[in-house]
């Protein structure tokens, strides 16, 4: 008999068939308590779990005594109780490599659109305000040769560094838990403490996961240290930033503009002051949202679950020591 797995995110037909070739697949709409109660027998027998954008916590795991592996269609896993999974020797798989280039593209788009005011001036054109040759009130700022600070020099940070170094001749500062020799050799990136990065960068790009240590890492103190001409970019996780402090910094002119793909609460409230600011580019967590990349992430997650339930955890596993 094939192992039983629960799928809580729709998959393309070919990927669903790949999953079904290895497992008995039960599809549910979500992981809400109501769904779990209504499908109690299925959850009780499931050895695998695959999907995204749902919380997997200790309460859910109590209902899944046979669970051996869970696979998320994402690189981030802050919605998983990793300690609870590890305590129960349940593997957690994710998709860290598939989306690197696409998210770096999104970061670059935010850098360019904020500096050159692309969204703002496009809306002015649509509103019929372009009635003569444009003047300084339409101008943006240059990107090339400006200093870019990267907070979090992982795969995505490296991909962004490659773009700005070779494409825009930008000096790069970075702050991370450790020195990144490859970034320094390939892109002439300079490691520095966070305060120095904030004080010297024209663009500050935040690419950090959400952990207890990074929650509200950026607040009023950090924004106050940035140049008043600086542009802040966040495409990591929303709660790494104290959003109220960001709003205040923008309102007071402590920073020039912001390009945001992530927020403390998602979807962003329609009442958020960020939405009324012309110098803010706010997009709905589109970092990896292309047809090609989302398919690749789903395919990776399927393969990850197959590997995990076959005892193969050489890659893409958050807690591989569970398999020891």
Swiss-Prot record:
Belongs to the D-isomer specific 2-hydroxyacid dehydrogenase family. GhrB subfamily. It catalyses: glycolate + NADP(+) = glyoxylate + NADPH + H(+); (R)-glycerate + NAD(+) = 3-hydroxypyruvate + NADH + H(+); (R)-glycerate + NADP(+) = 3-hydroxypyruvate + NADPH + H(+). Catalyzes the NADPH-dependent reduction of glyoxylate and hydroxypyruvate into glycolate and glycerate, respectively. This is Glyoxylate/hydroxypyruvate reductase B. Its EC number is 1.1.1.79, 1.1.1.81. Keywords: Cytoplasm, NAD, NADP, Oxidoreductase. Homodimer. GO terms for molecular function: glyoxylate reductase (NADPH) activity; hydroxypyruvate reductase (NADH) activity; hydroxypyruvate reductase (NADPH) activity; NAD binding. The active site is at residues 237, 266, 285. One of its GO terms (cellular component) is plasma membrane. Its main location: cytoplasm. InterPro entries: D-isomer_2-hydroxyacid_DH, D-isomer_2_OHA_DH_cat_dom, D-isomer_DH_CS, D-isomer_DH_NAD-bd, Glyo/OHPyrv_Rdtase_B, NAD(P)-bd_dom_sf. Pfam families: 2-Hacid_dh, 2-Hacid_dh_C. It is found in: Cytoplasm. PANTHER family: 2-HYDROXYACID DEHYDROGENASE-RELATED (PTHR10996), GLYOXYLATE_HYDROXYPYRUVATE REDUCTASE B (PTHR10996:SF283).
